[in-house]
Amino acid sequence: SGKSFEQLAEAARTDWNSELEHFEIEGTPDQKAMFYTSLYHTMINPSVYMDVDGSYRGLDHNIHRAEGFTNYTIFSLWDTYRAEHPFLNLVKPGRNADMVESMIKHEQQSVHGMLPIWSLMGNENWCMSGYHAVSVLADAITKGVFSNVDEALAAMVSTSTVPYYEGIADYMKLGYI
């Protein structure tokens, strides 16, 4: 980029300070350090997964273009559905709306027709049980962050009715697992 390390470091400090200025907190130095460290962790993953022109390799291994949204990956939803995504709905709603759209694209490009379980770089690694993306979508819709309810509902129903995943066939037949 023709910039020195010092110039890049200063640009990173400026970007980070623009994120921090949205928060005014009180507490001890240790409590503030804990808050800002946790905030930093919310900005690491999920990560942007597309080229500068919006192209990305989808779950179907084809090249797709993110139109009108930023595509994300690294959805460790077992870890993030309870706190990170609800937090992002409050402080970074546009970012979380893009994550929800990315999850829906994941479902549409999946041979299983499922929202992400634990996606990594255009692949599903199936390392957790459950389908926590449904909670993320429902929360984003309820908070007014994501408005394409029909598309989201179709993805949630598709995900929750895949018969060969996590005993769903037995649940649908018997009403319990």
PLM regions: where:
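Aromatic-rich carbohydrate-recognition surfaces in CAZymes
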Residues: 73-177
